[in-house]
């Protein structure tokens, strides 16, 4: 039996179908990224897996139990999209409170290693932390009870680059400890650094279940940028897409770069006039996510 099992899960809200016939399984120790455009259903799927939303159809099981089963409380932790830190308490007070809740909580040293806060930061009100610090603090609070399964919704939002990289290090430590992690993300680097698997959602449907490496290895599009003077040449080609005019440059995409380049050369284009870059399916998905 897999740790997390989802079978033909569907969810409708006010008559609108948000999730459509979704099925997948997650093994213990997997780190799985949910990606897709805004409104794809990532947060709703997490809510269903956590028992915060009832299913319209299908089923979900965690450790063989329904998500609403109280026996899961000690093994499952959640970092919601919005921080839920009590801001009028000091950082150290919140840490002490959370440590008192769990019978086998993280030690002060373990917390310090994860947070990397100064004594001054720990003695100040949580409201005084920066956005990225609050996010990291919320994440560490979710770890204090030593959960075996983590659900993280946009975990690194508001984090700067260094804090985000520290988060990735923590995730990789948790993976080595066998913690199962399911998270949503808008950052391609994050997925490439941490995810073992990728579930791609689009308009409420699970359209891909793959890995970062597999997506990177798939057929690539070439993106060309060249002077506007070649517009008439491109308009005669049927193997180019996404033609855009920006300032005095022309950009387009193609999966038949060799043929297109041959036509451009025949019409006087030189290598010095063009810029070419690769774009994989993974790049395309994250570009859509940013829109």
Language model regions located:
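Conserved ABC ATPase signature
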Residues: 125-129
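Catalytic Walker B motif of ABC-type/P-loop ATPase nucleotide-binding domains
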Residues: 150-154
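Conserved structural motif at the start of ABC-family nucleotide-binding domains
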Residues: 4, 19-21, 73
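ABC transporter nucleotide-binding domain
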Residues: 168-251
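The feature captures the beta-strand-to-loop junction immediately N-terminal to the Walker
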Residues: 35-37
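Conserved ABC transporter NBD signature motif
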Residues: 51, 57-72
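Short, charged/small-residue-rich alpha-helical element at the C-terminal edge
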Residues: 221-291
């Amino acid at each position: 039996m897999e740790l997390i099992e989802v079978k033909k899960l569907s969810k409708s809200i006010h008559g609108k179908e948000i999730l459509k016939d979704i099925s997948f399984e997650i093994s213990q120790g997997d780190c799985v990224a949910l990606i897709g455009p805004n409104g794809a259903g990532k947060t709703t799927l997490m809510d269903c897996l956590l028992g915060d939303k009832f299913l319209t159809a299908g089923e979900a099981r965690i450790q063989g139990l329904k998500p609403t089963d109280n026996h899961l409380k000690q093994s499952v932790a959640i970092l919601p999209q919005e921080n839920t830190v009590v801001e009028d308490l000091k950082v150290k007070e919140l840490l002490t409170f959370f440590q008192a809740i769990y019978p086998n909580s993280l030690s002060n040293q373990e917390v310090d290693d994860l947070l990397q806060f100064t004594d001054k930061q720990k003695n100040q009100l949580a409201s005084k932390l920066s956005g990225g610090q609050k996010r990291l603090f919320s994440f560490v609070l979710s770890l204090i009870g030593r959960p075996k399964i983590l659900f993280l919704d946009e975990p690194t939002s508001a984090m700067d680059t260094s804090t985000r990289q520290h988060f990735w290090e923590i995730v990789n430590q948790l993976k080595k400890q066998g913690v199962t992690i399911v998270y949503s993300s808008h950052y391609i680097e994050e997925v490439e650094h941490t995810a073992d698997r990728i579930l791609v959602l689009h308009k409420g449907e699970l359209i891909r279940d793959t890995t970062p490496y597999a997506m990177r290895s798939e057929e690539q599009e070439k993106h060309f940028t060249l002077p506007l003077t070649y517009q008439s040449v491109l308009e005669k080609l049927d193997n180019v897409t996404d033609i855009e005019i920006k300032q005095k440059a022309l950009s387009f995409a193609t999966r038949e770069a060799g043929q297109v380049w041959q036509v451009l050369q025949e019409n006087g284009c030189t290598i010095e006039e063009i810029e070419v870059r690769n774009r994989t399916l993974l790049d395309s998905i994250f570009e859509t996510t940013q829109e």
